Amino acid sequence: VNDAESDQRFTPRPRRAAARSHDRENLVEELQAIRRRVQMVSCTSRDSFHDGSDAYDVASMVIIRLAALFERPEFTSYLTAITREERLAIATTRNIAAHTGYKSMNDDLFWAAVTQRVPEILDRLIEESAGPEER
């Protein structure tokens, strides 16, 4: 198989409208799952939030899953209610949590991000991605 044949063979077909509706439903479900994780973290105290605690691990998953949504092309049209700066902050926090380790994480900023900023972002994204029947 040459390169031209390979390109044709692996070119994705255009998505149908039904698939886009399913994408929206999947996005809303994932945003709600992230919100549940945020609530789990918020139910703990700041004093008990540290590297190695369950809440810290759940908070890391909040950031990792939220950042992953912005990398999915099928969700792009539903994720416009967030600023460029917010996207960069989420990606940076995810990179610290996932790649450089928690030693370089500022726990106070991480706590504030997950318990204050992320809920505000989730509210906007859920509102934006909700279908007319859900508003």
What is the meaning of each model-derived region?
Residues 1-135:
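Solvent-exposed interaction patches of small proteins and small membrane subunits
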